[in-house]
């Protein structure tokens, strides 16, 4: 399976999972001049910035481990950009959804 197809399928699995958990999906593949946020959702009062990582095996490590410090810093900047567009302040949370084959692990508050 091509990398882009794998990512798109992973994002669909993640969205389906989030909807079953009661999240409201606000944005998918939110693009800015600085990069992209996979999913932006609302969970209660929180705006949740969600990075989705999918792998077919652990051969190259667990998917969640690829959300390293550099990626975290980038997501924080992208979140500030998104929040600045809103008319109201919301608490923000950063989650990672790691999918290994089709097994989903949702890591809430993955980083601050």
Curated annotation (Swiss-Prot):
<dbReference type="InterPro" id="IPR011335">
    <property type="entry name" value="Restrct_endonuc-II-like"/>
</dbReference>
<dbReference type="Pfam" id="PF02021">
    <property type="entry name" value="UPF0102"/>
</dbReference>
<comment type="similarity">
    <text>Belongs to the UPF0102 family.</text>
</comment>
<dbReference type="GO" id="GO:0003676">
    <property type="term" value="F:nucleic acid binding"/>
</dbReference>
<protein>
    <recommendedName>
        <fullName>UPF0102 protein THEYE_A1950</fullName>
    </recommendedName>
</protein>
<dbReference type="InterPro" id="IPR003509">
    <property type="entry name" value="UPF0102_YraN-like"/>
</dbReference>
<dbReference type="InterPro" id="IPR011856">
    <property type="entry name" value="tRNA_endonuc-like_dom_sf"/>
</dbReference>
